[in-house]
Amino acid sequence: NRPKILKVRDEQRAVIAATLATATGPLTVVTAHLSFVPGFNVRQLRHIKKWIDDLPRPLLFLGDFNLPSGVPARVTGLTPLLKEPTFPSYRPRVQFDHILADGLSPLQLEAARSSARVWSLPVSDHCAVSVDIPLP
């Protein structure tokens, strides 16, 4: 009963960041699609967290992290804005898609949490996520 080695082919993954110039200062938005391979996605998340530490705040970090609820916030130390299942899109049972924030004011944080939504769309096996951020 030797353990079997399972080689998994994964596709290239990316992270994109944009810092928007608003009337009240910068707003940074980061999105990523992490690996579905357990452990590797956590390593990717830790690497991204180090990279975004130097980006301007406030900051939103969202996307398909392929990690269950609670894990991304624990790994990054960022504040979760959404805690709802997003997968599979036809009957969501687990949260793999996340919206995290850092540097929001208490008023922005409250408004963002109340506006965070999950959308079931016929284009993916995951639900889409969205949030509105009020600018002071």
Predicted regions and their residues:
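Structured beta-strand-rich core segments of catalytic domains in phosphoester-bond hydrolases
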Residues: 1-26, 113, 117-120
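A shared catalytic/ligand-binding motif for oxyanion handling
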Residues: 20, 27-31, 54, 60, ...
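Solvent-exposed loop/turn segments connecting transmembrane beta-strands
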Residues: 8-12, 37-41, 92, 121-123
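Low-complexity, intrinsically disordered Gly/Pro/Thr-rich segments
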Residues: 82, 107-120, 128
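Surface-exposed cleft-lining segments at the edges of enzyme active sites
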Residues: 2-8, 30-39
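Metal-dependent phosphoesterases centered on the DNase I-like endonuclease/exonuclease/phosphatase
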Residues: 37-108
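Active-site beta-strand termini and strand-to-loop segments that position acidic
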Residues: 17-24, 102-103, 124, 130-136
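Histidine-centered divalent metal-coordination motifs
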Residues: 33, 64, 126
